[in-house]
């Protein structure tokens, strides 16, 4: 039998299988169990009462987390004219049109978010096979195709997260770093849940938010007592 690492032993000793933790208790325990050298991300998984096989029950959107994600975000914007100047002023890392597309075709894809104004989609459309598999293709449903590129840049830099139900009807999102105060992590999760509830498909029946699980990059998943969340 493989020998347990020190961290695995700590998890086995301190995590109670099947227990529902209050949010604060879960956040503190994950921080206590985080013994690796880099600051782990804190992630949330939300099981929704939807049938992802039905197109009208796919839940997707974006939330600006009030306390950010703790990550620096690189943003590229496809636009031109005054909108390009506004995007740069808002903090975009790169702004362009055909020349930016050429750079991406050449392999320069060191971006976390790609935004486009509607008039730039003729250029961005050529990049579907490059941006699509990386989750970078601009989409109006998550606010990355918009005439107001400056606001989209500000949102991305402020810690906007994009989400979509997976094949099991689960939303996955980063909600901060393990060194965030529990209250700030909770505010981020509650903001996400509020948007998920706002986007509830009309055809979804029964319990909508079924389960919320909090975890770190390398840590265990802890089920959250929904009564401890305000959203």
From Swiss-Prot:
This is Large ribosomal subunit protein uL1. Signal peptide: none annotated. One of its GO terms (molecular function) is rRNA binding. Gene3D superfamilies: 3.30.190.20, 3.40.50.790. InterPro entries: Ribosom_uL1_bac-type, Ribosomal_uL1, Ribosomal_uL1-like, Ribosomal_uL1/biogenesis, Ribosomal_uL1_3-a/b-sand, Ribosomal_uL1_CS. Coiled coil: none annotated. Keywords: Repressor, Ribonucleoprotein, Ribosomal protein, RNA-binding, rRNA-binding, Translation regulation, tRNA-binding. Binds directly to 23S rRNA. The L1 stalk is quite mobile in the ribosome, and is involved in E site tRNA release. Protein L1 is also a translational repressor protein, it controls the translation of the L11 operon by binding to its mRNA. NCBIfam families: rplA_bact (TIGR01169). It comes from Pseudomonas aeruginosa (strain ATCC 15692 / DSM 22644 / CIP 104116 / JCM 14847 / LMG 12228 / 1C / PRS 101 / PAO1). Belongs to the universal ribosomal protein uL1 family. The keyword Ribonucleoprotein applies. Part of the 50S ribosomal subunit. One of its GO terms (biological process) is translation. The gene is rplA. GO terms for cellular component: cytosolic large ribosomal subunit.
């Amino acid at each position: 039998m493989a020998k347990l690492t020190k961290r695995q032993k700590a998890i086995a000793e301190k995590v109670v299988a099947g227990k529902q933790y209050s949010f604060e208790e879960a956040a503190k325990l994950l921080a206590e169990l985080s013994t690796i050298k880099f600051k782990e991300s804190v992630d949330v998984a939300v099981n929704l009462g939807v049938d992802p096989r039905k197109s009208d029950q796919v839940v997707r959107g974006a939330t600006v987390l009030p306390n950010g994600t703790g990550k620096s975000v690189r943003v590229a914007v496809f636009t031109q004219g005054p909108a390009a100047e506004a995007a740069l002023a808002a903090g975009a890392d790169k702004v362009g049109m055909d020349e930016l597309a050429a750079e991406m075709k050449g392999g320069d894809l060191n971006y976390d978010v790609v935004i486009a104004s509607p008039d730039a989609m003729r250029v961005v459309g050529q990049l579907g096979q490059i941006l699509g598999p990386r989750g970078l293709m601009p989409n109006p449903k998550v606010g990355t195709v918009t005439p107001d590129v400056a606001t989209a840049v500000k949102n991305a830099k402020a810690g906007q997260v994009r989400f979509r139900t997976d094949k099991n009807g689960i939303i996955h999102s980063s909600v901060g770093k393990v060194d965030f105060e529990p209250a700030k992590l909770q505010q981020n999760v509650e903001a996400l849940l509020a948007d998920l509830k706002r986007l509830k498909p009309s055809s979804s029946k029964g319990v909508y938010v079924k389960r919320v699980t909090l975890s770190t990059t390398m840590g265990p998943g802890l089920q959250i007592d929904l009564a401890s969340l305000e959203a």
